Design a protein with these regions (language model features):
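A shared catalytic/ligand-binding motif for oxyanion handling
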Residues: 1-188
Length: 188
């Protein structure tokens, strides 16, 4: 199973969309979670064109010129049991058709405005607590867990502590990411 999670910074950017299509097809991606789509809506043709396989899609519209989440799962691999959304997340409860294992994938896009940090973490904790299946939470949290996650020395330890406390309260474990260390590098 392969999950692609990417802050695409604008689904309308043709170069990024071409990269997305190529990656989904070359790597045979089963789950797609995009943040910062900067889109209100998607056409069926756009979504069908992303993969050679059928996907179930849902999206959270952008707020003006920022935000937006797109989540899709391959329908030949997964049956979708339920979908949910909040201000900062989209989720699908899915069952893997091959092994009959049910779990929930939650894609988040945390607020860049750290004044909304408490609302984001509270919403995420409430969502995880309501889950009846094991969960995978992925996305752009707009937060860091350690000083090594930051490229500059400007670190707000209070936010880092809040994030780590929330992760501990949800009993989540971090999965090492693959790819560029920072999403804004030239190897997007």
């Amino acid at each position: 199973m392969k999950l692609l999670c990417w802050n695409i910074r604008g689904f309308g950017n043709l170069g990024r969309r071409r990269q997305l299509i190529d990656y989904i097809r070359q790597e045979d991606i089963n789950i797609v979670g995009l943040q910062e789509t900067v889109r209100q809506d998607f056409s069926i043709q756009e979504l069908q064109g992303l993969s050679r396989h059928p996907f179930a899609w849902q999206w959270l519209p952008a707020s003006g010129q920022s935000g937006g989440i797109l989540l899709g799962v391959r329908e030949d691999f997964f049956s979708v049991e339920d979908m949910d959304r909040g201000e900062f997340f989209l989720s699908m409860a899915i069952t893997d058709r091959r092994v009959n294992l049910s779990w929930e994938v939650i894609i988040v896009y945390g607020p860049a405005d750290h004044g909304r940090l408490a609302a984001f973490l509270t919403e995420l904790q409430d969502k995880v607590e309501r889950c009846t299946f094991p969960v995978v939470v992925a996305g752009d949290f707009n937060l860091i867990r350690t000083e090594a996650d930051k490229s500059s020395p400007n670190i707000v330890r209070r936010r880092m502590r809040m994030f780590n406390d929330a992760i501990a309260a949800m009993a989540l474990r971090e999965i090492a990411r693959v790819g560029a260390r920072f999403t804004w590098t030239n190897k997007q």
